[in-house]
Amino acid sequence: MPNLSRLGDTNQAGGAIMRGAPTVIANGIKVGLHVSQITPHGPGPHDAAVTTSASPTVFAEGVAVLRITSGNSCGHSIVEGSPDIFVP
């Protein structure tokens, strides 16, 4: 199972998750939520990327949570996450 991703966790190019659940915390950090913007990490599609996939079964505040392997609209995927929380 992939690790849960959180606000500030990054994709392989360094773009970071910008949307976190205000009331759901993992390892002291807000849980990353689907359809999050990703910080700009290059030109073209990398300057306005959003997440395109998330856990199909785990939700926070009614929104699917992000995890390592969650895709981004620029073609990258999330590569950072919680060291000890895993989600399907």
Which stretches of residues belong to each language-model region?
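Intrinsically disordered, low-complexity proline/glycine-rich segments
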Residues: P2-P88
